[in-house]
């Protein structure tokens, strides 16, 4: 599936660049305890933005099945994303 392939490639990119997003999260947090959560949110937000951009480029909007697929892929890869932030 085209969307799944795209999302997996985005997850790969953002996990490789996780250190940059962790640094960005540090800039937004006074409390060091929430840096990892903030970085996770930034990364998932970037992936979601890219996901929506696919539809915008096609003059379309995601339907509930597309959103469900996005959510499932993020959940399935959340451990990988979190580990990339921690290491």
Annotated model-derived regions:
Residues 1-26:
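Short terminal alpha-helical segments
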Residues 26-27, 42:
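Short, flexible segments with low predicted structural confidence
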Residues 53-87:
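Charged low-complexity stretches with an acidic bias
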């Amino acid at each position: 599936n085209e969307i799944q392939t795209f999302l997996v490639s985005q997850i790969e990119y953002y996990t490789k660049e996780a250190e940059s997003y962790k640094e960005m999260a540090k800039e937004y947090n006074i409390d060091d305890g929430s840096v990892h959560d903030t970085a996770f949110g930034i990364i998932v937000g970037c992936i979601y933005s890219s996901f929506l951009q696919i539809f915008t480029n096609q003059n379309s909007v995601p339907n509930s099945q597309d959103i469900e697929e996005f959510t499932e892929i993020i959940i399935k890869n959340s451990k990988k994303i979190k580990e990339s932030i921690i290491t």
